[in-house]
């Protein structure tokens, strides 16, 4: 294979002319498209960085809100627990007061029944004494009979 110098020079000249023609008519357009694409890529990267920063800020803000909500929930829980404890204490106190009231009423009722029973016993004692007196007046009572009547009276009274 032989290399013809004139063909090589001619090819180099053609290549240079094609480059000059392409540069003259298309290089600015291609360069503009490339710069436009580079700007778009840079804007997209910038936007992605901004979005990532916003996302980090939202994440921090959401974590703060979550922490605040947890603290608020804890405060509410503690307040409700304290309220429940207070209500429990009030219920227990009211129950104690009611129990004491019932106990007091029962004691008063027992005291009334005791007084009523004592009154009935006294009434029966008086009735028995009257009956004994009537029997004593009906009979001539000697000391032995008198003792027997008193013993019967005591037995009836339950002393």
Curated annotation (Swiss-Prot):
Keyword Membrane assigned: yes
Membrane topology value: Single-pass membrane protein
Protein localization: Cell membrane
Protein name as it appears in the record: ATP synthase subunit b
GO CC annotation, single: proton-transporting ATP synthase complex
Family that this chain belongs to: Belongs to the ATPase B chain family.
InterPro entries linked to this entry: ATP_synth_B-like_membr_sf, ATP_synth_b/b'su_bac/chlpt, ATP_synth_F0_bsu_bac, ATP_synthase_B_chain
Alphabetical keyword list: ATP synthesis, Cell membrane, CF(0), Hydrogen ion transport, Ion transport, Membrane, Transmembrane, Transmembrane helix, Transport
NCBIfam families the UniProt entry points to: ATP_synt_b, PRK13461.1
Major localization listed first in the record, in broad terms: membrane
Coiled coil: none
PANTHER family (UniProt xref): ATP SYNTHASE SUBUNIT B, ATP SYNTHASE SUBUNIT B', CHLOROPLASTIC
GO molecular function, one term: proton-transporting ATP synthase activity, rotational mechanism
Native source organism of the sequence: Clostridium beijerinckii (strain ATCC 51743 / NCIMB 8052)
Record's keyword annotation contains Transmembrane: yes
Subunit structure: F-type ATPases have 2 components, F(1) - the catalytic core - and F(0) - the membrane proton channel. F(1) has five subunits: alpha(3), beta(3), gamma(1), delta(1), epsilon(1). F(0) has three main subunits: a(1), b(2) and c(10-14). The alpha and beta chains form an alternating ring which encloses part of the gamma chain. F(1) is attached to F(0) by a central stalk formed by the gamma and epsilon chains, while a peripheral stalk is formed by the delta and b chains.
Gene: atpF
Function per UniProt: F(1)F(0) ATP synthase produces ATP from ADP in the presence of a proton or sodium gradient. F-type ATPases consist of two structural domains, F(1) containing the extramembraneous catalytic core and F(0) containing the membrane proton channel, linked together by a central stalk and a peripheral stalk. During catalysis, ATP synthesis in the catalytic domain of F(1) is coupled via a rotary mechanism of the central stalk subunits to proton translocation.
Transmembrane regions: 7-27
């Amino acid at each position: 294979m032989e290399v013809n110098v004139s063909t090589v020079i001619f090819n180099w000249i053609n290549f240079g002319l094609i480059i000059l023609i392409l540069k003259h008519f298309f290089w600015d357009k291609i360069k503009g498209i490339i710069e436009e694409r580079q700007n778009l890529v840079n804007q997209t990267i910038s936007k992605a960085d901004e979005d990532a920063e916003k996302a980090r800020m939202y994440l921090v803000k959401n974590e703060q809100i979550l922490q605040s909500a947890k603290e608020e929930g804890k405060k509410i829980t503690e307040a409700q627990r304290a309220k429940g404890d207070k209500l429990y204490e009030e219920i227990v106190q009211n129950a104690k007061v009611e129990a004491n009231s019932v106990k007091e009423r029962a004691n008063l009722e027992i005291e009334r029944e005791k007084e009523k029973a004592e009154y009935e016993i006294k009434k029966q004692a008086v009735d028995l004494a009257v009956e004994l007196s009537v029997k004593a007046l009906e009979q001539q009572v000697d000391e032995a009979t008198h003792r027997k009547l008193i013993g019967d009276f005591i037995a009836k009274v339950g002393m």
